[in-house]
Amino acid sequence: MIRDIALAPSGKQKISWVKEHMPLLNILNEKYSKNQIFNGLNMVVTIHLEAKTAYLAQVLKNAGANVVVTGSNPLSTQDDVAAALADSGVIVFATHNCTDKEYDMYLSKALDVEPDLIIDDGGDLVNMLHGERKNLVAKLIGGSEETTTGVHRLKALSNNGKLAFPMIAVNDAYCKYLFDNRYGTGQSSWDGIMRTTNLSVAGKTVVVAGYGWCGKGVAMRAKGLGANVIVTEIDPIKGIEAVFDGFRVMPMQEAAKYGDFFVTVTGCKDVITKEHFAVMKDGAILSNAGHFDVEINIKHLEELTVEPSYDCLLYTSDAAD
C-alpha cells in the first residue's frame, strides 16, 4: 500500500546512491545473502522510510527474511523510496503525510504477517503488540528499537514488568548515541531548517530545548554556523554540562524572549506552548527534531493565528506589538 508505483525510478536512484556510502551494510549484505541467516522468518520493519533505511530492508530481504515495511513517522516517509522498495519485492504499507488512522492501519496490516522479528523506531509497533495485537506475542522471538523515545517507552514497560518479549535497545549502543544522535541529528536538523527557511543562522540566537545527545549535536552545529546558542534543560547535570560547553542555560519562559530559531529535541510533550508563544519575537522560527510531533503545541499556535498561510502561522502577541 504505497502512493504510486510510478515513483519507483526516483527511489531506486536514491537507494543506489546511499549503497555507495554504506560499506558496513554492504559487507553484511554480501555475507548474509549467502548464508540466508533469516531464511523462513517474517520480519516487520517500522522505520523512517527513506533511502538508507530502505537499503537496510533490502539487505534483510536478501538475507532470507520475508520483510514488511511501514513508516515510523508519516512526515518522514518518502513516497518514491516506498515505491522502489515495493518494486523490489518488499511488502510496504506507507504513504507520506498519512492520517493517524491510516498510520495505525498500516502498522496493523504489517503485523498481519505474524512476525518472528521486529525492528521498531519510536515504539508504536511495540505498543500495538502490547495492545490490540497482543495475540501475536507468542510467536515473536524479539526485536530491536532504534531511537531514544522508543527506548524510553521500552524501559517503562520493562520497569513495570509488562514487556512481553526481548528487545535490543539500539539507542544505548555507543555507535548510535555518540555518532548518529549527536552528529547525524545535529547536521540533518540544520540542513532541514536552512533548506526550508533559506535564512542565515550566523548571528542569530538559537534556542535548543534538551541537551541529550541529539540536543548536544544540534547546539554544537548551531554554534559552528555562527549562532548564539541558548539551551533549556530540566536535568541540572546536563544543564551544567551545557554551560561548560560554552552555552547559556535558562528556562524556556526566559529563552523564548530571545530566540530567532527554536529547535526542540527532548522527546517530551508541550515543551513550547502558548505562554512561550506570547513572548516570542515576531518571525521566530519553530522546529522539532524529536521523534513525535508533540513538543511544540501546534493547537495553541493555531488558536493564536490571525492570518494562516501555507508557509507560516502569523499571530499577534505583546512581544510583536
Label each region the model flagged.
Residues 47-53, 73-77, 123-125, 213-214:
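Gly/Ser/Thr-rich loops at beta-strand to alpha-helix junctions
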Residues 2-38, 72-76, 82-204:
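Glycine/serine-rich phosphate-binding loop and adjoining beta1-alpha1 elements at the start
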Residues 66-75, 230-232:
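Short internal beta-strands
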Residues 1-4, 315-320:
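Conserved small/polar residues in nucleotide/adenosyl-binding loops
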Residues 137-148, 278-314:
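ADP-ribose/adenylate-binding Rossmann-like module
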Residues 50-63:
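Histidine-anchored nucleotide/phosphate-binding helix
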Residues 250-295:
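Rossmann-like NAD(P)-binding element
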Residues 50, 187, 194-256, 264:
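Glycine-rich phosphate/diphosphate-binding loop of Rossmann-like nucleotide-binding domains
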